[in-house]
Regions:
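Active-site core segment of subtilase-fold serine proteases
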Residues: 1-58, 62-82, 89-90, 127-132
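Loop/turn elements at helix/coil->beta-strand transitions in domains of secreted/extracellular proteins
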Residues: 18, 92-97, 129-136, 162-167, ...
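The feature captures the short pre-catalytic strand/loop hairpin that immediately precedes
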Residues: 27-46, 200-206, 229-254
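Sec-exported extracytoplasmic/periplasmic mature domains
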Residues: 60-64, 118-125, 158-162, 172, ...
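C-terminal subdomain of the subtilisin-like protease fold in secreted/lumenal serine endopeptidases
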Residues: 74-86, 133-137, 225, 265-274
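Short acidic, glycine-rich surface-loop motifs adjacent to enzyme active sites
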Residues: 96, 103, 120-147, 170-171
Length: 274
């Protein structure tokens, strides 16, 4: 069914679901250069890639049993992970809103990030922010982030945080031989930058691909936290119940986003900074 999907339209009854909603800000042919974005209601991951699908599974995947079926049992009782082909995400009961800002031609422009962030603050554009996103996961970024280069984005991130949204982004994959490199938008004050950790024996250490900070030029203590980001198994696009293994800070970010969603559930009155 996935292989025959027409990404330019949403088939009746297929989307949105109780679990997943979203929007495509770019359209299939948008490259970020001379093309005009053609938004539509289907944020399906681009064919042959699967980055967004993998990230979504880490945040809120329900898990796949050995019988090849989505898990629909109790997550609070002790789970026997040996009975899973694909383990559940960090916050498996969370609802996902997939916002697609890249076309299928290339991933070389973040021109539509601001549009997506404004949507996160007010999804139905009615000037009532009560329906804002609780957590904004940004598994993207440029290699070198400079605070003063991104003033418009910084203001939006600050406003989202004031509204109560937790914004999480990757520190970047600039490797541990380079310091003073943190990817934008993780470089911003109000964004939680996540580094990538790997299991080394019985201890988690910073993964070789992960940026280590601090930020440039103000030497902010970034990243603020690390999370698993090497040899991470999650949902594989187009398979229904299959998995794939990816590396990168993009996979560390949803671990923190999922934890933030659980914190929001347990403490709905907490501010984003709390």
């Amino acid at each position: 069914a996935y292989q025959t999907n027409d990404a330019t339209k949403v088939e009746e009854g297929s989307f949105p679901t109780d679990k997943v909603d979203g929007w495509d800000f770019a359209g299939k042919d948008y490259s970020g250069e001379d093309d005009v974005p053609l938004p539509d209601g289907d944020p399906l991951d681009r064919s042959g890639y699967g980055h967004g699908t993998h990230v979504a599974g880490i945040v809120a995947g329900v898990g796949v049993t050995k019988k090849g079926r989505p898990y629909d049992g109790d997550y609070f009782a002790g789970l026997d992970y040996s009975e899973f082909l694909l383990g559940p995400g960090v916050a498996p009961k969370a609802k996902l809103f997939a916002l697609k800002i890249f076309g299928d031609k290339a991933l070389n422009s973040t021109n539509l990030v601001l549009d997506a962030l404004e949507w996160c603050a007010d999804p139905n554009a009615d000037n009532d922010f009560a329906d804002r996103m609780d957590v904004v996961n940004l598994s993207l970024g440029s290699t070198l982030g400079l605070e003063e280069k991104h003033e418009a984005e910084a203001e939006v991130f600050t406003n989202l945080t004031r509204l109560g949204s937790v914004v999480v982004s990757g520190a970047g994959n600039s490797n541990n031989n380079n310091f003073y490199l943190v990817a934008a938008p993780g470089v911003e004050h109000s964004v939680i930058a996540v580094g990538s950790a790997k299991l080394d024996g019985t201890v988690y250490r910073m993964a070789a691909h992960s940026a280590r900070g601090p930020s440039s030029p103000y030497s902010l203590l970034k990243p603020e936290i690390t999370a698993p980001g090497e040899l991470i198994q999650s949902a594989r696009m187009g398979t229904g119940t299959g998995g794939a293994w990816f590396n990168g800070t993009s996979l560390a970010v949803p671990h923190v986003s999922g934890a933030a969603a659980l914190a929001k559930q347990a403490h709905p009155g907490w501010s984003a900074t709390e």
